[in-house]
Amino acid sequence: MGRFIFVSFSLLVVFFSLSGTEAGVCCPLGWSGYDQNCYKAFEELMNWADAEKFCTQQHKGSHLVSLHNIAEADFVVKKIVSVLKDGVIWMGLNDVWNECNWGWTDGAQLDYKAWNVESNCFIFKTADKPLVTYGLQWDTQFRLQEPG
């Protein structure tokens, strides 16, 4: 019986998705393929905006990772578990001045919502613009059984 590792998405390891690859097409060297997308983890410390910018500079069409089902999320976690230090990564889900309407940086449809039901978003209007504060917690607890 092995122990379980719990991973939630938030802050440390930068991970990217390169969409639009066709079946049978190889990903760039150092990238891993899954369901017509290519993925790569980078151990770079940066804020979310810089992480997205860094990602778009890696390869044409690349963005921070977007997740569309539990199988894809499991694939991502298995690829990054060896480099995780604090168990958290940046992902492409954002709400930049969009008043709690979340979206992926790659423009993909938000079809897989795995955040905590207790997540909340508060909008305070100021004279100039809305001030948005939120506590969004991605709630998918990935359980990877370690050998031993």
Curated annotation (Swiss-Prot):
The signal peptide annotation in the UniProt record is 1-23
Gene3D superfamilies registered for this protein in UniProt = Mannose-Binding Protein A, subunit A (3.10.100.10)
Its PTM note reads:
Contains disulfide bonds.
Positions of the C-type lectin domain: 34-148
One MF term in the entry's GO annotations:
toxin activity
Summarize tissue expression.
Expressed by the venom gland.
Name the principal localization, coarsely classed.
secreted
Keywords assigned by UniProt, alphabetized? Disulfide bond, Hemostasis impairing toxin, Secreted, Signal, Toxin
Q: Which InterPro entries match?
A: C-type_lectin-like, C-type_lectin-like/link_sf, C-type_lectin/snaclec_domain, CTDL_fold
Q: Where in the cell is it found?
A: Secreted
More about this protein = Shows greater sequence similarity to the beta than alpha subunits compared to other heterodimer snaclecs.
How does this chain assemble?
Heterodimer; disulfide-linked.
Q: Which family does it belong to?
A: Belongs to the snaclec family.
State the name under which the record lists this protein: Snaclec 8
State the organism named in the record: Echis carinatus sochureki (Saw-scaled viper)
